[in-house]
Curated annotation (Swiss-Prot):
S-S bridge residues: none
Enzyme Commission no: 5.1.1.8
Catalytic activity: trans-4-hydroxy-L-proline = cis-4-hydroxy-D-proline
Family, similarity comment: Belongs to the proline racemase family.
Observed phenotype of the null mutant: Cells lacking this gene loss their ability to grow on t4LHyp as a sole carbon source.
Up-regulation conditions: Is up-regulated when the bacterium is grown on t4LHyp as sole carbon source.
SUPFAM superfamilies with a match to the protein in the record: Diaminopimelate epimerase-like (SSF54506)
UniProt keyword Secreted present: no
Residue numbers annotated as active site: 91
Protein name as annotated: 4-hydroxyproline 2-epimerase
Length: 337
């Protein structure tokens, strides 16, 4: 055992979905863009991602974010999202949580009005959050996400045991393959987690075979990582219940922030909802909701897109100062799949 560098983190959850916020210990190159910062992490600090996301400090479903300095005065901070397997372009449950944590822990100056605005730089684009607070209480976050759009509809594929289905490919900060489970026997519930995970990975591979993924304006965004299953809600007043399957088969416990953005674009394209029509989304656990709204139209290059906002709340779980022995293969992080 020897003295190691120390990395300070904050732990939160958003409707059950965890977040490890890594806010110290990484010497990002001065003046670097968010893409350059991610490349720097991938080349020099990917071991830190693995050590904090994986066992013994994390677990198979841990999610995290590197909270970085801004690259210019146009932003207040940068967000680089991670899990035990890879990096994500954006994360809504994470944005809700990190914005509230920044206000609660003094990482950003509070606006005297009780509504603090934070401009985040992500690898998906600009995300603007507003955090409500009153006295020593931090109440909620609402953020305007990057523009969302439907890239493809009615992608036919076969899901073993559940017959022929169709998926829509939708961008909402990440690309999602959205699949309607109504009419099948597969239900979205924690007790069906293993089956949902297995079917999500199969569906993702089938969709990847059928469509080429490429963002209209961001050349670096060309991957499908998320599959969303949805059916009727179990909470009164919700438009739907869904679960997002991603990376190595992890299940988002929350309704999903980028997922709610994609789902609103999906429903708007099919005429189910309109602009400026608030909706409520239900997640895997059936115990909490997000509020969403499409506040307008825009374009991504020549592609029509919509402007999603998502509102939710997160809870503080604790803080930690981690030391990591990179010479110990167990201490450096491992996964049991």
């Amino acid at each position: 055992m020897r003295v190691q560098d120390v990395y300070n983190v904050i732990y939160t959850h958003t409707e059950g979905e965890p977040l490890c916020i890594i806010y110290s210990g990484v010497p990002y190159p001065a003046g670097s863009t968010i893409l350059e910062k991610r490349a720097f992490l991938e080349e020099n600090y990917d071991w830190l991602r693995k050590a904090l996301m994986r066992e013994p400090r994390g677990h198979a479903d841990m999610f995290g974010v590197f909270l970085t300095p801004p690259s210019s005065r146009d932003y207040d901070a940068g967000l680089i999202y991670i899990d035990g397997k890879e990096y994500s372009h954006m994360c809504g449950h994470g944005t809700i949580a990190v914005a509230m944590a920044m206000v609660a822990n003094g990482l950003v100056a509070r606006d005297p009005s009780g509504l603090t605005r934070i401009r985040f730089e992500t690898t998906a684009g600009l995300v603007v959050a507003e955090v409500a607070h009153e006295g020593d209480r931090v109440l909620w976050t609402r953020f305007e996400n990057v523009p969302a759009y439907v890239a493809a509809q009615d992608i036919a594929f076969e899901l073993p045991g559940y017959g022929p289905l169709k998926a829509d490919l939708v961008w909402g900060g990440n690309y999602f393959g959205i699949i309607d489970l109504r009419g099948t026997s597969l239900r979205i519930a924690p007790e069906n987690g293993s089956e949902l995970s297995r079917m999500g990975l199969i569906a993702r591979e089938e969709i990847r075979k059928k469509v080429k993924v490429q963002h209209p304006t961001e050349a670096h965004i060309n991957n499908l990582n998320f599959v969303t299953f949805w059916h009727e809600p179990t909470i009164e007043g919700c438009l739907y219940k869904n679960v997002h399957v991603f990376s190595a088969g992890q299940l988002d416990r929350s309704p999903g922030g980028t997922g709610t953005s994609a789902m609103m674009a999906y429903f708007e394209a099919r005429g189910v909802i309109g602009l400026n029509q608030p909706i409520t989304s239900e997640g895997l656990l059936g115990s909490g909701t997000f509020e969403g709204c499409l506040i307008g139209e825009t374009t991504l290059g020549t592609v029509r897109a919509v402007r999603p906002t998502v509102k939710g709340t997160a809870g503080m779980l604790g803080t930690a100062s981690w030391t990591i022995n990179r010479e110990d293969p167990v201490d450096a992080g491992f996964l049991v799949l």
